[in-house]
Structure formats: structure tokens, C-alpha cells
Amino acid sequence: MRDSPTHKEQRAQNTMSDQMPFPFNNFTYFFTLFSKFFSSFHHCTCSLSVSRQYLALDGIYHPLRAAFPNNSTLRRHFTKNRTPRHTGFSPSMTSCSKEHRQGTAPKLPSPNYNSGTEGTRFQI
């Protein structure tokens, strides 16, 4: 029985570890949406702002189709269509500038908005 590997075996082990960056113990493959590609790490396809159930944080398997609405191409626009304003240009492809819009412009904050009555004191 030998205590240590020979120089040739040690060099072969070092070469193999340089070529294989992933350990074989508990190694799993995660498949992406494209079946011909695979990876050893998760590929997220949704933002972290989606609800808890779509991230499968509740420990239950949820089908992929549950994360996407059936009518995703038929979504309604949530912004109101404004009536176009006249800019004086023909055809009117530009929007009205701030001076020509109806109503008052929003009041800008004071340049001393975050300043207190006393000066800032830094202590070390």
C-alpha cells in the first residue's frame, strides 16, 4: 500500500483539476428554456420583483406557464392617450415645450433643501 501518489499521478490529477472547474460530487445540471444548451448554474428568466409563488420560494413546484399570462400580446395600454397639442410646426411631430403647456410649472425645491439652520458639523 502506498502513502502518496507518484509524480506522474500527481501531475495527471493537477491537469484534470485545471481542465474541470466543477466538482463532481453533488453536481447537477440545470436546463435552460433551450434544450440544446445546459449549464451548471441557474439562468433566471424573471425579475426578483415577481411574486413569491413564481420564484418557487414556497417549496411547491409551479408550472412555467403560470408565470406568463395567456394574453401577453393582447395587453391594454395603461396610459391615457392625450389629445395632441399644436406646436406651430407642420406636421406636428414634436411635443409642446414647457413654456407652452397649460398650467403652472412645478415649483423647484430650494437649493438649501437639506440644509439645517446650523452648519454641518463633522466629527472624527
Curated annotation (Swiss-Prot):
Where on the tree of life does the source sit, at the highest rank?
Answer: Eukaryota
Q: Where in the cell is it found?
A: Mitochondrion
Q: Which GO terms describe its cellular component?
A: mitochondrion
Q: Which GO terms describe its biological process?
A: regulation of cellular respiration
Alphabetic keyword roster? Mitochondrion
| Lyase among keywords | no
Q: Where is this region: Disordered?
A: 80-124
Name the InterPro entries for this protein: TAR1
This chain's function reads:
May be involved in mtDNA stability or mitochondrial gene expression regulation at the post-transcriptional level.
Could you identify this protein by its name? Protein TAR1
Organismal lineage: Eukaryota, Fungi, Dikarya, Ascomycota, Saccharomycotina
Point out the gene that encodes the protein. Answer: TAR1
